[in-house]
């Protein structure tokens, strides 16, 4: 099994309950069962015709060289491989649970016991689950949650579903997957094209949601940047206005001289007591007074 099938993103398994292709009503189931029975009858008739063709005697055999015979064999083998899918009705089975750490090659080997498997698709676990398991010290191997397998013959798909569903894988007792229980369901009326169409549809929806989230994030970022720039511009305008006001106040301010008001004094006898100033006595008078006392 190539890696490309296991790495492709798949739709969530919870949405399969709403999918009318996988789960149908009673009337739809009757129609599907009748359709399957008709396909089985057609397939059985084709197989009977092939057996009759093989049993017919080869009366018209032409003598050919060994090289020509070998080329004819190769041509018939290629034609048989290309026509095998068109001759037989394919059948698809759904695996709701894949044993832990089982690789697609191992699962293909198990399913091949019941018939030839054409295509196999397994859905990987989500990345955050894998990282959480590894971070907590768990196994680093890749796990698959669910899958789909397409058998070349529809009867092989039915046999696989009826045999493996609810039973252990078995095999040798020492096998790592001996006791793992398989959950397999045959999907009547379901073809591989339906699966790929739904996967493409789910991928388109996921991509549209992603684009919408990206556009919303870009819009929020642009609005945030615009608000930041506007805030800076408003702050600069306020600072400039404040600076201009301070400069205008300094220019308009008048220069005023201040004078110290002296106390009014008078030596006149008629002056009031609050303004009267006593004259200092002479030095000679002070000396005489000092000598007397």
From Swiss-Prot:
<dbReference type="InterPro" id="IPR034353">
    <property type="entry name" value="ABT1/ESF2_RRM"/>
</dbReference>
<keyword id="KW-0539">Nucleus</keyword>
<feature type="domain" description="RRM">
    <location>
        <begin position="91"/>
        <end position="181"/>
    </location>
</feature>
<dbReference type="GO" id="GO:0005730">
    <property type="term" value="C:nucleolus"/>
</dbReference>
<dbReference type="GO" id="GO:0000472">
    <property type="term" value="P:endonucleolytic cleavage to generate mature 5'-end of SSU-rRNA from (SSU-rRNA, 5.8S rRNA, LSU-rRNA)"/>
</dbReference>
<dbReference type="GO" id="GO:0000480">
    <property type="term" value="P:endonucleolytic cleavage in 5'-ETS of tricistronic rRNA transcript (SSU-rRNA, 5.8S rRNA, LSU-rRNA)"/>
</dbReference>
<feature type="region of interest" description="Disordered">
    <location>
        <begin position="1"/>
        <end position="68"/>
    </location>
</feature>
<feature type="compositionally biased region" description="Basic residues">
    <location>
        <begin position="234"/>
        <end position="243"/>
    </location>
</feature>
<dbReference type="InterPro" id="IPR039119">
    <property type="entry name" value="ABT1/Esf2"/>
</dbReference>
<comment type="similarity">
    <text>Belongs to the ESF2/ABP1 family.</text>
</comment>
<comment type="function">
    <text>Involved in the small subunit (SSU) processome assembly and function, and in the 18S rRNA synthesis. Required for the early cleavages at sites A0, A1 and A2.</text>
</comment>
<feature type="compositionally biased region" description="Polar residues">
    <location>
        <begin position="267"/>
        <end position="284"/>
    </location>
</feature>
<dbReference type="GO" id="GO:0034462">
    <property type="term" value="P:small-subunit processome assembly"/>
</dbReference>
<keyword id="KW-0694">RNA-binding</keyword>
<dbReference type="InterPro" id="IPR012677">
    <property type="entry name" value="Nucleotide-bd_a/b_plait_sf"/>
</dbReference>
<feature type="compositionally biased region" description="Acidic residues">
    <location>
        <begin position="7"/>
        <end position="19"/>
    </location>
</feature>
<feature type="compositionally biased region" description="Acidic residues">
    <location>
        <begin position="36"/>
        <end position="58"/>
    </location>
</feature>
<dbReference type="GO" id="GO:0003723">
    <property type="term" value="F:RNA binding"/>
</dbReference>
<dbReference type="GO" id="GO:0000447">
    <property type="term" value="P:endonucleolytic cleavage in ITS1 to separate SSU-rRNA from 5.8S rRNA and LSU-rRNA from tricistronic rRNA transcript (SSU-rRNA, 5.8S rRNA, LSU-rRNA)"/>
</dbReference>
<protein>
    <recommendedName>
        <fullName>Pre-rRNA-processing protein ESF2</fullName>
    </recommendedName>
</protein>
<feature type="region of interest" description="Disordered">
    <location>
        <begin position="234"/>
        <end position="286"/>
    </location>
</feature>
<dbReference type="InterPro" id="IPR035979">
    <property type="entry name" value="RBD_domain_sf"/>
</dbReference>
<keyword id="KW-0698">rRNA processing</keyword>
<keyword id="KW-0690">Ribosome biogenesis</keyword>
